UniProtKB/Swiss-Prot annotation:
The cytochrome bc1 complex contains 3 respiratory subunits (MT-CYB, CYC1 and UQCRFS1), 2 core proteins (UQCRC1 and UQCRC2) and probably 6 low-molecular weight proteins. A ubiquinone binds at H193. One of its GO terms (biological process) is mitochondrial electron transport, ubiquinol to cytochrome c. Gene3D superfamilies: Cytochrome Bc1 Complex, Chain C (1.20.810.10). This is Cytochrome b. Heme 1 (or BL or b562) is low-potential and absorbs at about 562 nm, and heme 2 (or BH or b566) is high-potential and absorbs at about 566 nm. Its cofactor is heme b. Binds 2 heme b groups non-covalently. The keyword Cell inner membrane does not apply. The keyword ATP-binding does not apply. Belongs to the cytochrome b family. Signal peptide: none annotated. Heme b b562 binds at H75, H174.
Length: 372
């Protein structure tokens, strides 16, 4: 440990020489976090957390504030970039067995939950139609809690419906949570450098380590530059690509949109929620879709850490990726046939991965022992 700290102080953080591009998403997430905090701060200067003024204040930012449209679009597209990076980051963790570093994995899942809460609160702030109705639907899930549900919902809303107090507290939460994310990120990175990164074969890197700078820092810069280029391409040519058309109308509690849905990065969880025709069951499945990630370090049965040399588990992993994409797609569709059955089947497949992963690990161990 002491040697690692000396190397760290000498700007020579030792990192395995064979980590691939999939390990670059951590630095990309850090870039997203810095950008979201900065653009969010500039937006907060001009934003007004009042149900009568919120929508107008966002229009004022995009029309009248110098470069306000840039800040607003960067913040909106940046959120999508953040989630693309975090989902790839988690997928890499599952594929290469990074979750066996338990402290790092569990702090990472805590970060994901905090990030999802932050994004949800942020989505409500423009006070557009979809903002309002998505907030109504999601916060209403609290009523599914036996005995305490209604009291908790009223407490969260600050009244008997979503109103001015709700928007004010959501803005306060959206402002404070990024600083909690920054703190958790620091803990996540400190815990990571306690043991160091894993690598594609899942072996010990101690025999072959190189300084982080200049080797991996330049490699990180390439991917960060690619991400920023993509961000500015979307900003310049199609800034509303990821926005919901309903959000261009001011929130109206009297008119319900035809199809209420959250932002695209929550659709996989929303698809799982919708596929269960029971409020409490759906809410539990929604929570479990994220919480189940915490089980992976404790259900690992394979002798090898990574999936690199485990073809059976690889098939299972890519099924999970296909399931995630299919769930996202079906959640954009109305609740009718055949989308109901597709959602239900893919929801089963999603949880099936976490049940089958330890079983397949054990099976592969048996196959390896037979070959010996």
């Amino acid at each position: 440990m002491s040697n690692q700290h000396i190397l760290l102080m000498s700007n020579l953080l030792p990192v395995g020489s064979n980590i691939s591009t999939w390990w670059n998403f951590g630095s990309m997430l850090l870039t997203c976090l810095a950008m979201q905090t900065l653009t969010g701060f500039f937006l907060a200067i001009h934003y007004t957390a009042n149900i009568n003024l919120a929508f107008s204040s966002v229009i004022h930012i995009t029309r009248d504030v110098p470069y306000g449209w840039t800040m607003q679009n960067l913040h909106a597209i940046g959120a999508s970039m953040f989630f693309i990076c975090i989902y790839i980051h988690i997928a890499r963790g599952i594929y290469y067995g990074s979750y066996l570093n338990k402290e790092v994995w569990l702090s990472g899942i805590t970060l994901l939950i905090t990030l999802m809460a932050t994004a949800f609160f942020g989505y409500v702030l423009p006070w557009g139609q979809m903002s309002f109705w998505a907030a109504t639907v999601i916060t209403n899930l609290l009523t599914a809690i036996p005995y305490l549900g209604t009291t908790l919902t009223t407490w969260l809303w600050g009244g008997f419906s979503i109103n001015d107090p709700t928007l004010t507290r959501f803005f306060a939460l959206h402002f404070i949570l990024p600083f909690i994310i920054i703190s958790l990120t620091s803990i996540h990175i400190i815990l990571l450098h306690n043991e160091g990164s894993s690598n594609p074969p899942g072996t010990n890197s101690d025999i072959d380590k190189i300084p982080f700078h200049p080797y991996h820092s330049y490699k990180d810069m390439l991917m960060v530059t690619t991400m920023i280029t993509l961000l500015f391409l979307i900003l310049s040519f199609s800034p509303d690509l990821l926005n919901d058309p309903e959000n261009f109308s001011k929130a109206n509690p009297m008119i319900t949109p035809q199809h209420i849905k959250p932002e695209w990065y929550f659709l996989f969880a929303y698809g799982i929620l919708r596929s269960i025709p029971n409020k409490l069951g759906g809410t539990l499945a929604l929570l479990m879709s994220i919480a189940i990630l915490m089980t992976t370090p404790f259900t690992h049965t394979s002798y090898t850490r990574s999936m690199t040399f485990r073809p059976l588990t690889q098939i299972l992993f890519w099924t999970l990726v296909a399931t995630f994409i299919t769930l996202t797609w079906t959640a954009t569709k109305p609740v009718e046939s055949p989308f109901i059955i597709i959602s239900q089947m893919t929801s089963i497949f999603y949880f099936f991965f976490f049940i089958m992963n330890p079983i397949l690990g054990w099976t592969e161990n048996k196959i390896m022992m037979m070959n010996d």
